[in-house]
Amino acid sequence: MIVDAQSVKNTDSAEQKGYDAGKKVSGIKRHIAVDTQGLPHAIAVTTANVTDRDGALAALDRCKANLERVESVLVDGGYTGQPFADGVMERIDATVQVVKRNELHAFVVLPRRWIVERSFAWLEKCRRLWKNCERKLNTSLQMVHLAFLRLLLRRS
């Protein structure tokens, strides 16, 4: 399983928003846990001021019954720390593997991390998800679910 978060800007009509100081985005964050095919197994939408670690744990909490067979979770450098690893172990009994970025500051495709980035790119094909125009976080979450359902229906 591969976990990542995406910050999305808000429109003026959105009620719930936070500020992600790392990416300088005022809006929401989408936390997604995908399998090796890029299909989502856990999704959470939070305000942007929620850390990646807390949002990922919230996503895993929502779908813990479906994640019984997961053995390891691949994450990027934003998820380092023993409390996150302990939280994953407690929730789904899986180990955490942190994929470190290249220190040379050159663009390098991180192994197996591109899968979750591709899933975010699939979401960006839905024009409604380019920005968060929903008033409630739950509505944004349901729009992400609908986008992935549309993708799955087209593939079958």
Feature locations, PLM:
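Polybasic low-complexity intrinsically disordered regions
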Residues: 1-93, 97, 101, 147-148
